[in-house]
Amino acid sequence: MSYSGTLRVDLRSPEFRGRARVLLAFRRPGALRLELPGPTGSRLVVVARQDVLWAVFPGERAVLRTGATAKELQALLGVALTPDEIADVLVGVAPKGLLRYEARWGSILPREVRATLPDGARLVAKVEDAEIDAALSPAAFDEPAHDGFRAIDASEARRLWSR
């Protein structure tokens, strides 16, 4: 199963608040790509494949390489879900451990999802456009280009994208 979509995401937790337009694609099992577009190109490109996650900040020439776990995604994005659990949320399946989940359905896929994550963070994702079983290039889930970029940790990565 694959998915490609454009979302408006609002995330609120005791330590973080943010809103963003997100371009997101996934292919099961275990492949996720997320981009935060900016005025001159992507501000952030996140690719998770199997057990590895890359977060590339083209404008900052910075890269984070870490595990593709719920803990690492929480440290980076504030979302304590695995890549496959993010996929579940977007196709209308409540992952185990969510405190609350509500999907407002379009004809085939949810058009809006509201969830309270295991850590209490509240996530609202409004789907602007989405396609299920999208024809995605395998290269979409390759390690993003980052030759010559400096290595950063999750706290610096979070600071870079959330400012």
What do the PLM-derived regions correspond to, one by one?
Residues V22-F26, A48, R100-R104:
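Extended lipid/amphipathic-ligand handling interfaces
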